[in-house]
């Protein structure tokens, strides 16, 4: 069975490796163009391209698929049975969705219809969801509105960051899409179920502006945001006129004026919130490295009563 693969980041690269390891023929891999990255802004190949080259696969990097006759012709010439799409980042027009014999399967990191859109992992943590998961979806022209082929649940742990949930769902998604491809190969079709009309939510893209901590919120709400925005864009506060990223914290039952520092020690930097307080245990000063609070407190001291 011929499988076109389309994806860009690590989440997708894991799925590509799994599909290849399962023995499926992959005549073509699509990924986004190389982009400048890092402090030196060095042109860097996306993880899917790196994986594809290691696997000896053909890679193409079109800027767009909409109104791109050359790309459409390339896809048609492959005569693929199905396309697997995972965090590709380009919009697939209807003529592309219709090109493979069995259409396009998407690996989506939420339990649809909850958290359709760009940042499902982060929004699930931020909202305090007890669980999330992966859906393998038969793509249509809408935003994550296609019929669901399979659903795989994951219990969000109380200390899970977006990075940790991402890595768990990456492995779940890779295994899930292989299982569904194997079913398609053996049975010639997949049983897909329409998404329910109730329970639809949208996972808006994250912004640096919303990552700024609002101390008037409850400590529980802020703690979830810190985990949801870890590692990027990272929740932050202003400290000495510069943004300081907050990497890990925990809720403590203390009270004070919102934003007031209650204590600063090797055990934690405790800041009052709208309800309860937050004990910060890991942070990253502007231009510095991530550090635990003991390392931070050894070189700096924030007086009780100071405002963040």
From Swiss-Prot:
Protein's gene: fmt
GO biological process, one term: conversion of methionyl-tRNA to N-formyl-methionyl-tRNA
Catalytic activity of the protein: L-methionyl-tRNA(fMet) + (6R)-10-formyltetrahydrofolate = N-formyl-L-methionyl-tRNA(fMet) + (6S)-5,6,7,8-tetrahydrofolate + H(+)
Pfam families referenced in this protein's UniProt entry, alphabetically: Formyl_trans_C, Formyl_trans_N
Biological role stated in the UniProt entry: Attaches a formyl group to the free amino group of methionyl-tRNA(fMet). The formyl group appears to play a dual role in the initiator identity of N-formylmethionyl-tRNA by promoting its recognition by IF2 and preventing the misappropriation of this tRNA by the elongation apparatus.
Positions with a binding annotation for (6S)-5,6,7,8-tetrahydrofolate: 110-113
UniProt-listed Enzyme Commission number(s): 2.1.2.9
Protein keywords: Protein biosynthesis, Transferase
Protein's UniProt keywords contain Protein biosynthesis: yes
Entry similarity comment: Belongs to the Fmt family.
InterPro entries recorded: Fmt, Formyl_trans_C, Formyl_transf_N, Formyl_transf_N_sf, Formyl_transferase-like_C_sf, GART_AS, Met-tRNA-FMT_C, Met-tRNA-FMT_N
Listed name of the protein: Methionyl-tRNA formyltransferase
HAMAP family: Formyl_trans
GO cellular component: a single term: cytosol
GO MF annotation: an example: methionyl-tRNA formyltransferase activity
Record's keyword annotation contains Hydrolase: no
